[in-house]
Amino acid sequence: MFLGGLFFEWIQTVLILAGYVSGNATFPKPLNKSEEKKYLDLYAKGDESAKNVLIEHNLRLVAHIAKKYADEKNLEDLISIGTIGLIKGINTFNPQKNSRLSTYISRCIENEVLMVMRSSKKLQNEISIDESIGTDQIGRAHV
């Protein structure tokens, strides 16, 4: 149940993000401290629309962090992965710890991105059983 809900939230957020990335629209500005507290309180009371506001207003942070680690080929993938970190961060944020939401979720986003980058780096060294041994990528034999 939890993973299905998280996946649905992720898809919804990625669609919102895709609209910003592909169009001329800009990301919503980050919430100020009082607005952030208001929406966190509403979300704590079960208001899912408040959670969506928190997600939308922190997408700029996701894009900023993803750009630090991305090249031209994987920016969109890292933004999607960072969005998962954003959602996880909002779900686990504890306002009683006296830190700003943006501080906490920036670590969650960065951790999610780095975790995926580490796992994909491990896979780069693996060789498929279908790959020819002794030839390069275009099929020339090595001597």
Residue ranges of predicted features:
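Alpha-helical promoter-recognition and RNA polymerase-docking modules of transcription initiation factors
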Residues: 2-122
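Long, serine/threonine/proline-rich intrinsically disordered regions in eukaryotic cortical polarity
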Residues: 133-137
